[in-house]
Amino acid sequence: MIRFALIVASTLGFVLTAALGNLMTPLLRAFRVRQEENEPPTMGGLCLMVGTLAAVGVGWTAACVAQPELLGTESLLTTRLLIALFGVLCFGAVGLADDLVRLRHRSPLGLRRPVRLALEAASGTLVLALLGLNHCLPDGLALPGVGYCTLGPLAPVVWLAILVALAESARTADGMDGTVCGCAFIAMLGLMTAMTLLGWFPLGVLPAALAGALMAFLLWNFYPAKLRPGAVGCQFLAGALGCVPLSVGWPGLTLPLALPYWLEGGMVALQIIVWKASGGRRQLFGTAPLHRWLEKRGFDPVNIFYIFGVLAMLGLALTLQAARAS
C-alpha cells in the first residue's frame, strides 16, 4: 500500500502542477517588471509548492489509512515528514520574498545578500531545532570507505552550512531553461530510491510528489521556457534536497544529489574569491556560473540541459552507491 501511496502522490503532484501552471502562467506574465516582452515570467515555483504540498498531504493520508502503524511514535515518521515539509516551505518562502523584492522595488538582484543569508540561516536553524527537540537530529554522516563519522557538537553547524550553501548554489542556477527543474527531478528519483534502500520507504511520499510536480513543470520550463521557477522555486528545491535527507538522518546524501548545484555555486564562489584576492584584477573563469560558461563556449540551451542531466545522473549514481554501501 505504501507503493500505491507513492503513485498517488506523484500522479497528483503532476496533475495539480500542470493545472496550476496553465492557470498561473498568464497571471504571472501580467506581473512582470523590467523584463523583455519575450522573456518568460518567473515565480513559477509557486506551482511546485502548492502542487507538492497537496500531493504529499493526500499521499501520506492514503498511506496512513492503509497502514495505521505509520502513525506510531517509534520512528516518528509523521514528525520527520512534517519537519521536512516545514523546512522546504521555509526556504521557499525566502525565495518568494526575494522574488517579491524584485517585482515591487524593481531590483534585479532581489534581497540584499546579508538579509537573504540571514533568512536562510534562520530557516535552517528552525529545522535543526525542531529535529533536535524531537531527537531526530543526526550527529554525523556516513562517508564511503570511512564509515560513520561523528561530528559531535559541530554537527548542527555543518548541517546549517550545507543548507545555506545549497540554497545559494541553487539560486545561481536559475538562468537556463529546464536545468534547475530537470536536475531536481533526477535528484528526487535518486532520493526516493535511496530512502527505500535505507529503510525510509514511507517517507518517499515527499520526493515522489515533488518528482511528479517537476515533471509537469518541465512542460513549461523546458526550452523554450514559458515559465521559470524563479528564486521561490530554486529555494524550494534546495530546501527539499537539504531538509529531506537531514530529516531521515542521512544528510550526506545531499552532497551527491545536488552535484549540479554545487558545481554552479562553487564556480561562482571561486570566481569571487579569486577576484577579491587579486584586488579585482583577475578572474579564474571567463564567466560564471557553469551554465553561463557553457553558453559562452557555444553550447545551446538544449545541449546545456543534457549536460546538466548527465551531471545529475552522476550524482544519482553516487547517491545509490553510498546508500548500498551503508
Which ranges hold each PLM region?
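Short, strongly hydrophobic alpha-helical membrane anchors
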Residues: 1-2, 326
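"…together with the soluble PPM/PP2C metallo-phosphatase catalytic core" -> "…together
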Residues: 2-263, 319
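Membrane-proximal soluble regions of multi-pass membrane proteins
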Residues: 30-33, 260-307
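Final/C-terminal transmembrane alpha-helix of multipass membrane proteins
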Residues: 301-322
